[in-house]
Amino acid sequence: MPSFRPNISNDLDTIIFECNSNYDTIVEVTKWFLQIAYLIPGGILNILLLYTILFKNSEIYASSSFFLIYSTDCFVSFSMIFLDIIGRTLVYFTPLCPIIAPMFYEPLIGFKIMMIVLHHSRACKSLIQILLVVNRMSCVIYPIRYGKMWMRPLKYLIILVFVIPFSIDWNLIISRVYMQPTFGGIYMEYIKKVAWASQSRFQLIFITIALLFTIVCTSVIFYTLVMLPKRLRNVERTLSLGTAYISMSFIILVVFQFLFAFYSDIFTTSTIFGYSLLSYDILNVGSPIIMHCVSSKLRNHVLRGSRKLSSAARVVPVSNVTSTNGWVNLIVITL
């Protein structure tokens, strides 16, 4: 299907489009239903994890830099899922398109903000990923100093997670955002004021850096854990599951961001657009599921709502951690 090309002389011109009626309504609505069926539970799970870590059981998790970083990821993931639910409804719930299309001919302020927040959040995800893998690596390399080493600069690092992505928002802020026909519905697009400053290329830079950090840090983690005694192999297996998932997710993201960055004219309105949306779903929905599976203590707190910990569940202060046992405790806490 050819790309939609708006023909305007200034940013205030009306952009008129028609919904594509070639798509089967039943098929498109089924796509919408299937995606909403996992996006809503995924959003709820992110909120539950965020609430458990920061509020309900904060006395347990507030001493773990890993969980504080991960709670930031839960917040960003929920924000993206919330916006994605709106976006997927516009794209796939095709009966709405002919009804609401005339509402989107004029310049879009609300959806421009939505698009900025969505791209900003995607960059945040890459930065959070870097913090998570570096945090885990430092945990196994410096088990004694790990806690103090992270807690001091952590609040500044989290602030930077939200501040740094503003460096790539500027072109989107000054550009015209409009709706274009996408599948049987509509979706947001923008007319770049600065031609070279593509959001997809900016995102590709962030994601590629995050992927490199993931590969290097997890390689160091695996090498270090292999050196541990045999009785600690269960920890290695659990960590392998999480890191393998993260690596796979970012490889998928890199592939789709590469296609959009350099072949956007070909792929913007094709099926690959839908796959690119799903690639972020893998991160936003899959990540809390993985965390829910690998951390039995966190899972119990989320599901059972218990505020009390047995001695085995309590986070061990860094000052009390010694020798190999301390190493294991810190690794288990971060998982």
Curated annotation (Swiss-Prot):
GO molecular function, one term: transmembrane signaling receptor activity
Alphabetized UniProt keyword annotations: Membrane, Transmembrane, Transmembrane helix
Cellular localisation: Membrane
Protein's membrane topology: Multi-pass membrane protein
BP-aspect Gene Ontology terms: sensory perception of chemical stimulus
A GO CC annotation given for this chain: membrane
TM region(s), chain numbering: 33-53, 66-86, 98-118, 154-174, 202-222, 242-262, 271-291
This protein's record includes keyword Flavoprotein: no
PANTHER family: SERPENTINE RECEPTOR CLASS GAMMA-11-RELATED (PTHR31627:SF12), SERPENTINE RECEPTOR CLASS GAMMA-RELATED (PTHR31627)
Similarity annotation: Belongs to the nematode receptor-like protein srg family.
Protein's UniProt name: Serpentine receptor class gamma-11
